[in-house]
Amino acid sequence: MVSLLKKLIGSRNDRLLKQYRKLVTQINALESKTAALSDQELAAKTQEFRTRHAEGSSLDDLLPEAFAVVREAGKRVFGMRHFDVQMLGGIALHNGKIAEMRTGEGKTLMATLPVYLNAIAGRGVHVVTVNDYLARRDAEWMGRLYRFLGMSTGVVVPQQPNDEKIAAYAADITYGTNNEFGFDYLRDNMEYRVEDRRQRALAYAIVDEVDSILIDEARTPLIISGQAEDHTELYVRMNAVPPLLTRMASEPKPHEPEPEGDYWVDEKSQQVFLSERGHENAERILSQQGILPEGESLYDPRHIALMHHLMVALRANTLFFRDQQYVVQDGEVVIVDEFTGRLMVGRRWSDGLHQAVEAKEGVKIQHENQTLASITFQNYFRMYDKLSGMTGTADTEAYEFQEIYNLETVIIPTNKPMIRKDQNDQVFKTAQEKYNAILNDIRDCHERGQPVLVGTTSIENSELLSGLLKQAKLPHEVLNAKQHAREAEIVAEAGKPGHITIATNMAGRGTDIVLGGSVDKQVDLIRADESLSEAEKEARIEKVRADWKPANEQVKAAGGLRIIGTERHESRRIDNQLRGRAGRQGDPGSSRFYLSLEDPLMRIFAGDRVRGIMERLKLPEGEPIEAGMVTRSIETAQRKVEGRNFDIRKQLLEYDDVANDQRKVLYAQRNEVLEASSIRPSVEALCEGAATDLVRQHIPADSVEEQWDVPALEQALAADWQIHLSLSDMLEKESSLTDDDILERVLEAVRGVYTGKIALVGEEAWAQFERSIMLQAIDTHWREHLSALDYLRQGIHLRGYAQKNPKQEYKREAFELFSGMLDRIRDDVVRVLLTVRVQSAEQVEQAAEAEASQPHVQNVQYHHSDYDEALAGTDADAQPAQQPVRNFMPKVGRNDPCPCGSGKKYKHCHGKLA
């Protein structure tokens, strides 16, 4: 019934494309009129559009004319005319949707249409790419078109001076990576001066390779961190423990005897679990090594951090391997992106995992970090007023885009029909048989002059295959994280006749593989050769173009680009991206995946079923299964993994939404402090609130005198705020004083101290000082709060055993932590402002200038330097040094008072976090 309805009225995608084609007809009707304009008249259209928009015309009203102008500018600047399908994609992007366009269909050029249209509004457009190379390339390449039309472009990259970044964000169009946009948002919310902030309000973003950024990287939060406590020696000593423990042959099953061994590894969840025997052996080994006191348990609150160190050491030794998840380069452990195969320089695993891997590899162990600020890409990109994206493979993730980001996916038809042949998978029993078949396929293609792109899932596999090709004397290029610098060059040559290229995953996205080889790359090299005259350059360029034509015809005759996959990835989308390198713009091509029962995906998810089929068929050695049923079985396994990963990302978002709501509130308050001309009313309200709470702790409202603890109140005022107020004497002299009268006397004393300090140093200098103290208190307590949330999150799943909803419990306790943090910020600010000793206005100004000149964070791993006291002569007791977050706790009984001083029992306070 559903399929019949679709035939009658068309799918949602068909109906959208039908609407968009009506607009394309309007744009095409304007082409001849626009072509008649001079260059100056065409450029002047930008100001005309801006004026009309300011006078009330919507961007939708301007769309046909604006798109026609961009198409004409593209013809004049690049000699390239936007196809009608690119117009369809541009309309989809403007409408805040994801445009799925096949590889080679011109996504970069298509993006110029909505970018130009939305830049007319003057609020800034962000174009988000997956790496710095593409950001710079696209900013320079497409910037020529925007400059021709009178618009400015900027690019943001790591390590860029702050003034350049501010200028780049002020441009009409800003290019950059997802990481840099996210980090700049966090940096802006750590600044101490308004003029140092970089980003404007987040208006519109187009995300290139949207699936890579919004899905593959959604589980990885952006974190700015500073150094925490040094546990270097502990990581080294703990690394010696895993080899002394025995791995179980299989995971324990309910109602069955536990297999021999100390721990088992769950490859699906990427976790390691200790058995009962494993706990006992681990405690014995740690005691022998002097790490754990004799007779004590790893689950004692004092030693809970040791348990954490042991588990990360086990994970580092059993789940993380060199040349798969990471490489060792220049004495450092560098993460390899599992989706692109690129090195992720500057990224580090959290929770001590990176340090554990460094200990395993015997390289220098970097300090642990304390989170100063963090955000996930999911929450960062949802802050834009309008978001859209483009990719070659979004349809498999359309549900997630709709569910998480409220982004609809529109599949844009190709300009020319797709004629690539996707063959069924071939499944072998062993990896050796699989590699023999791959070698035979590569050799056959090489002899026929057909270029081959071989996709692998790890650096280790790419180098294994490279070794086999060397033995077979087959010339080839390897493109993995270790050859990252030559990426564009290798990909540009991958389409030459008989060329063999091995690439990890989808390294090289963003550069098309042109059949016959890339002419543009060779032309660029000739133009860059200063030893040649202009005439010689033109002659050589002419020869290159002439030589390319027969090479292109030869490759097409041989069948186009051949894609060989050596393993299936967890995600069908990554496999489709590999296939998508062939068959661009109507070119011929073919693809096939070669698999074995020893491949990780097959072993974990589909091995038993396929092995059963092979055994029933009694296939001889070296003979594969090749059937649609097997391919479908593998895709079912991939769907299971995708579903599990989607659940993980959705759960991450549900938990992060709690922190995100708190982040929004705190950053909004911080921005108010930063932007307000005077924060004196806010500070006075804080002082009044803190004083009221202090009085009510000792003298409850509407209470009788017998319930009052006046000496304790006097002591608290003197100890906390250095206010010496003899309330006992007042009560002796004025016996009729009520609790409200005492509160008023305390408030008068607090106001007197506060205004006295302002009078001493002057309004302007004091305003600078109290702003600085307020910002410092917010930053200090926010980073402590992030650590507390992290601890809470790690153990919250255990609430399920008590028949409680972990998410609801997390929300409730996170709110309590947040409320407590706001109270501590208030108390700290009031204490510093009331107890600080000042001597002169000049010293205040000098200290404020010193604070403003503090170095600002400039890297992925930040050390947010502690600011010096803003006033000379500040009493040492007025602001105690910030202590690092520590994992170790004193030994406390469950029913003892919590050592944090809250007055609660330990089990009801920090015992819950432990």
From Swiss-Prot:
GO molecular function: ATP binding; metal ion binding; protein-exporting ATPase activity
Disulfide cross-links: none
Protein's UniProt keywords contain ATP-binding: yes
EC number, as in UniProt: 7.4.2.8
Cellular location(s): Cell inner membrane; Cytoplasm
UniProt topology in membrane: Peripheral membrane protein
Pfam families documented for this protein: P-loop_SecA, SEC-C, SecA_DEAD, SecA_PP_bind, SecA_SW
Assembly information from the UniProt record: Monomer and homodimer. Part of the essential Sec protein translocation apparatus which comprises SecA, SecYEG and auxiliary proteins SecDF-YajC and YidC.
Protein name: Protein translocase subunit SecA
Provenance organism: Bordetella petrii (strain ATCC BAA-461 / DSM 12804 / CCUG 43448)
